[in-house]
Each structure stands twice: as structure tokens, then as C-alpha cells.
């Protein structure tokens, strides 16, 4: 369990520090071009889930739903993590990344009722939805679990 919380803690720290910097230095809805034609730092808020799912629902309902769902997912991960063999570092790291990312965004939902997003990848006029460190950790962790599943671990 120590490594689960250590890795998750690092992800939470990176996520929250990066968001603090965005909140401090980038006005809401602003953008700074980093790699022309590909990458901006932006300051946007997401009241929904990935791709703004449920963003139009009443704020109280959204907050209760997302906080409850996050706590349920983290509880399931902690339970599953305990069953992963100690030598399976790949899967254990994947669970830790998902946990850290989920808790990083949970902190935003509790504090603000929404999530701070700031990474904007795009090609031409097509922009992927803005995301953050927590989202990246959840995505990488989920992909790692998928690879583990496909490899039969």
C-alpha cells in the first residue's frame, strides 16, 4: 500500500502545484502559445467529466455525483491493488496513477465545484479538449492496465 499512496501523492502534488501556477499566472480563458500549431497553456474550467460530460447538469448534483463516484473508484482501486502481486510493478503503478489523478481532480471539485484544465494540444483548428496532470495520470494508468490485460498479466 505504501507505493500506491507514494506514487498517488506525487501525482496529486504535481497536479495541484501545476494548477496553482495556472491560477496564479494565467487569467481565466487566456492562452499562451508554447509550440505554434500544436500546444498552448490555457486556463479553462471543466464543470463536467472528460470532454465536459454532464457539464450542463445542476452544480449540486454534479458535485455530489463526481465526489461519490471518485470515492467509489478509489475504494475499488485500493481493494484491487491489495490483490495485485507485489512483483507486478506495472499494474501497481497503473493503479497508483489512476488513484492520484482521481484524487487530484477530486480536490478541485471539492474546492471549486469544477476542475482546472490547462494543457491544450491541437493541430490547425482542431483542439483536443483541454486537460491537466491528473487527467494525464488517469489516462496513462488506464492504458497501462489495458496493456497488462492484453498481455495476460
Which residues are covered by each model-predicted region?
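Alpha-helical transmembrane bundles and membrane-interface segments of multipass inner-membrane proteins
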Residues: 1-153
Amino acid at each position: 500500500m505504501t507505493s500506491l499512496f507514494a506514487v498517488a501523492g506525487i501525482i496529486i502534488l504535481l497536479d495541484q502545484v501545476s494548477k496553482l501556477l495556472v491560477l496564479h499566472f494565467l487569467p481565466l480563458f487566456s492562452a499562451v502559445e508554447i509550440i505554434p500549431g500544436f500546444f498552448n497553456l490555457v486556463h479553462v474550467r471543466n464543470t463536467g467529466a472528460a470532454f465536459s460530460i454532464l457539464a450542463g447538469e445542476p452544480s449540486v448534483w454534479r458535485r455530489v455525483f463526481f465526489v461519490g463516484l471518485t470515492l467509489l473508484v478509489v475504494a475499488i482501486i485500493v481493494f484491487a491493488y491489495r490483490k495485485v502481486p507485489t512483483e507486478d510493478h506495472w499494474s501497481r503503478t497503473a493503479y497508483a496513477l489512476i488513484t492520484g489523478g482521481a484524487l487530484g481532480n477530486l480536490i478541485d471539485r471539492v474546492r471549486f465545484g469544477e476542475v482546472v484544465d490547462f494543457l491544450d494540444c491541437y493541430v490547425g483548428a482542431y483542439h483536443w479538449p483541454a486537460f491537466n496532470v491528473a487527467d494525464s495520470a488517469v489516462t496513462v494508468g488506464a492504458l497501462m492496465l489495458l496493456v497488462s490485460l492484453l498481455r495476460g498479466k
